[in-house]
């Protein structure tokens, strides 16, 4: 082993010892999956952390891919001050793209790195409990006018049920969770 690698290991060892067995949540945009090389680079780093005993939960979004799919299918999108209004049709597309394509792409890249990962949405195992976001007062930056906006099926997280996640982590699986949640009525 050359001296620079040995020095790097000496530098990393205290951190590995400190964080081994600890759980970290890594959140990234769905944009990461657009470029396979970027995704493979990120999953290489996640695999390294996982292999030295740092427990990871990955949470991902997918707003850009959702917009692209909506455009391809002719589903109109409403964005107010940079925030998406999620109507019924958009929610159906979000389920497809978040829990489907993006989650699967991340799982495949982790498998490429030898990591056993499990794909979930926040709805699976009741992991993410959310409530529908109430209408909000939004100020239009261009006009200064204030309006009340209902963002539709956009929710706010109120609780994380870690039971399933802990079960997976205790068995050396890496959970990959799409940013979908539900309320007590399953909506």
Where are the predicted features?
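Nucleotide/pyrophosphate-binding catalytic subdomain
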Residues: 1-187
